[in-house]
Amino acid sequence: MITIFIAICTSTCLNLLLQFVNAHYTYNVALILLIVEISKLLLCLIGMLCISRQRNCPVRFGFIVNSVLYAVVNYLSHYITKTIPVSIYSVLIQHKLVWIVFFSILILKKSFTKQQYCALIAVCSGCILTKMTDDSMGDVAKRQMSTGLLLIALQGICSSLSSVWIEKMMKVTERPLISENYNKLYWFLADSFQMYLFAIPIYATSYVLGFGAPVITTLSLEATIIVILLSILNGMILGAVFVYHSSVIRSIIAAIVIVILAIEHNIYSIPIISGIGLVLLGVIGWTI
């Protein structure tokens, strides 16, 4: 329970910090992500050498699956948000909890009680309602919407499969958490570097043409360090959630964070209040 509580706190703080930073500053997101992944990799390496005294950590090629899925999810996110409004995307992507349950049954051979199924349905429905805003129902071209729905479904499948596969890889043998995180990050680092290279032409083009020049303050070094440190802590804690709990619990943590952020924003409507109630009901139903 301590791991879950810390994961909720770090995820909430990171989301609030990033919302504030995105509203007031400009920075290279891809570069920050690359620095975070490199830092987590080095931290795990130091942990293996100094804490667990592990000198030999064989590379586990099974994490390539996560690396490929991670890259697909990132590229789909970039394309989908250009196809349909972000408000619609943030609502529809919540369906991935259904896929996580499906892949947990298929790959991990897990079983759930009827009460747990009802709790997960409540959490999924609550996330959708909580994310729903007035502009979520805006007009979108039918062709764009149909394409967007297919891509969101594909992204939901890839993201959910990646979560379940991480759980499978990190629980398949009795190995230290640090070494498992090291193996996972070893392959994810390639994706982060690829994302950084992919972002360079976008930044270069926008600055040359003039419409990408920062109109708000550049993120300071101190704020950058805080973002990086909190991202590292959040990533390591979520890795522990996969080991000591499950990908389903990871999704429930994300749902709780959505509720906390909705309450913090002080924007209340019937869908949002209903969504908060459903998520809380689902969490209670899952735990009792």
Task: Explain the meaning of each model-derived region.
Residues M1-I288:
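Polytopic endomembrane small-metabolite transporters, centered on the Drug/Metabolite Transporter
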